[in-house]
A protein has these predicted regions:
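Short solvent-exposed loop/turn micro-motifs enriched in small/polar/acidic residues
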Residues: 55-57, 77-78, 133-134, 162-164, ...
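Gly/Pro-enriched, hydrophobic low-complexity segments
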Residues: 146-239
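Intrinsically disordered terminal and processing segments
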Residues: 16-18, 27-31, 78-80, 128-141, ...
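N-terminal mature ectodomain segment of secretory-pathway/periplasmic proteins
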Residues: 13, 26-100
């Protein structure tokens, strides 16, 4: 269930937050088609930078989500020390190389959080529709020379892995694609811009993104990360 509140500025645009989301769902492929997906997999490359703009770390992962509500899946980190975490039928596992790792309760919680965070990112805007999200239309703004709708998102505590984070989404006013997001994850504020989209499947997924750390006044601090997505594969349910 989505609860929507709207500020007076909604009257100016004649669109509510829920209407903006509905159009974004269609622009990204449609909620009905999304609910028919059985398996979603892709490759994600992350490059981290320090404050001087020097590459700090590079990580390539193959992520897969499948089953009802995508509660099953695996995340494989590719490299010299290949690691794998998975959730299969409620069973949590982690391996490094060919060796399985004994999991503590903290390890299980970390794996669960990693999966929820990864799914949260890749499933937008559909997750905004499926989750118990509170959407608040905030204003119009200009982003990269184009009109953009700004919508704040919050969650009820203990009902979403990102409940403690404060999210704001930016929807292009013409295409209704999500073109950026801002998140306050104490103590940092990040502005994540969707630079390119992948439309090789029936959906408009992320292809290239950049995450910029912001100062408290909202000004740019430095580029923290770039993300490249590729090799998307979607398998639909038989029925």
């Amino acid at each position: 269930m989505i609860v929507v509140s709207c500020l007076f500025s909604c009257q100016k645009t004649q669109l509510t937050a829920t209407q903006i989301l509905s159009r974004s769902l269609e622009a990204h492929g449609g909620i009905e088609l999304w609910q028919k997906v059985d398996t979603l997999s892709f490759t994600k490359k992350t490059i981290l930078y320090n404050q001087d703009g020097v590459e700090e770390k590079e990580l390539t992962q193959h992520q897969s989500f499948y089953g009802d509500n995508f509660i099953n899946g695996e995340i494989i980190s590719i490299g010299a020390d290949m690691s794998r975490i998975s959730i299969l039928g409620g069973i949590y596992s982690k391996s490094i190389g060919d060796s399985l790792t004994f999991l503590t309760n903290d390890d299980v919680a970390l794996i669960k959080k990693s999966f929820r965070s990864a799914y949260y990112v890749i499933s937008q805007p559909f997750n905004l529709r499926e989750s118990d999200a509170l959407l608040t239309y905030k204003k119009d703004t200009i982003l990269n020379g184009e009109k953009t709708f700004v919508v704040d998102v919050s969650y009820k505590e203990n009902q979403n892995s990102n409940a403690s984070d404060q999210w704001t989404y930016f929807f292009n006013a013409k295409t209704f694609l999500i073109v950026a997001a801002k998140v306050f994850h104490s103590p940092t504020i990040s502005f994540i811009e969707n630079i390119k989209f992948n439309k090789e499947t029936p959906f408009a997924f992320n292809a290239e993104r950049e995450s910029i750390f912001l100062n408290k006044d909202g000004s740019k601090d430095y580029l923290r990360a770039s993300y490249l997505y590729s090799n998307y594969k979607v398998v639909f349910k038989n029925n």
